[in-house]
Amino acid sequence: MTLAIGGHVQRARVCGFIVLFTAAVTFSAHAWSAPCVSPISSCTEWLTVPGTPGRLLLYRTYPLDTKNELVTSALVVIHGASRNADNYYRSALAAGFLADALDTTVIIAPRFAAGKARSDEGQECADKLAADELSWFCGGKENWKNGGAAGFAPGLTSFDVVEQIVRSLARREVFPNLRSIVIAGHSAGGQFAVRYAMANRVQDRVSVAMSYVVANPSSYTYLDVLRPTHAAMISRYPTLAPGYQRVPEPSQKPFVEFENAKACPGYDKWPYGLEERVGYSANVSNADLKRQLVARPVTYLLGELDILPLYGFDSTCSAMAQGPTRLARGVAYTKYVTEVLGAQHRQVIVPACPHSARCMLTSDVSLPVLFPKQ
């Protein structure tokens, strides 16, 4: 076990496990405390959006209202359907340690809590809420992962909340040396990330570079009636689409107008497509959604082994129209946005990773995407 005396965060590996702890260090009046590296109450704060009711809990390594000249980047990590922001915070901390970026990165993990469950949702969709805590439904179009409105604050969406986080980070009087903000999400958080990338209007209003990391979502948002064929899912990865590995006809196009629209009328409705949008995106035009998605830097992190219909896998006909597995859907969507829409998005297949946020976030191939070099 070796301690680096000069570092704020002391690091060690014990029996193969990553250990993070802070040493007792005396700081000058112009120095900054060590990052908070545990999902405990002292590492949390409540976020409010001016002019709106309610508040949202978030975990963070540094306070968002205390001047910090050490921080040069920010990582906002969005949890999955289980709303376990504390576990996602742990995974992001592990990734920050492996990237040697904990001291200079403010890591934030917001919690989009679930309030009273709808009649078609189980009790696992009802969290214990603090006073005035914002909450959302788990399912349906009007939920947090699609930019839906909060339960008792219909004018406030989950996308508005992350916009407020971005605005807080972009304040030069607090983070004068911040140069990049990464919005990353896994599973349901990946759905949030890709839809937030195309819809948000804050990116063009701040002076900090923003990028997006979309990891293993169960569905994407297509901007027209095209859907992938087998030709869009050809890959050197044999696990891509089990049962769908036949070689396509030479003349088969990778994307065609969806042929089963009559039997699957919801295939092009929000959040799978642009029809009948609700929440934040309802106030953004189709043209702006396309323009922003194409123009913004997005990386798709896809687990090589995320091929099983588990962990909330969306098996509706609208989702199945996008591919048979999460991996296949991600490969096809990357091809769609780059070849059909003309975006310059990237795709990274994460070796040996199934549907696991910890595996995805801490992989060697993921770290440069989550913690880009300045």
Locations of the language-model features?
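Cap/lid segment of the alpha/beta-hydrolase catalytic domain
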Residues: 112-156
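A domain-start/cap signature at the N-terminus of enzymes
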Residues: 31-74, 82, 86-106, 137-154, ...
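Gly/Ala-rich beta-loop-alpha elbow adjacent to hydrolase catalytic centers
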Residues: 185, 189
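Conserved acidic catalytic loop of the alpha/beta-hydrolase fold
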Residues: 160-178
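C-terminal catalytic histidine-bearing segment of alpha/beta-hydrolase fold enzymes
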Residues: 301, 305, 314, 331-374
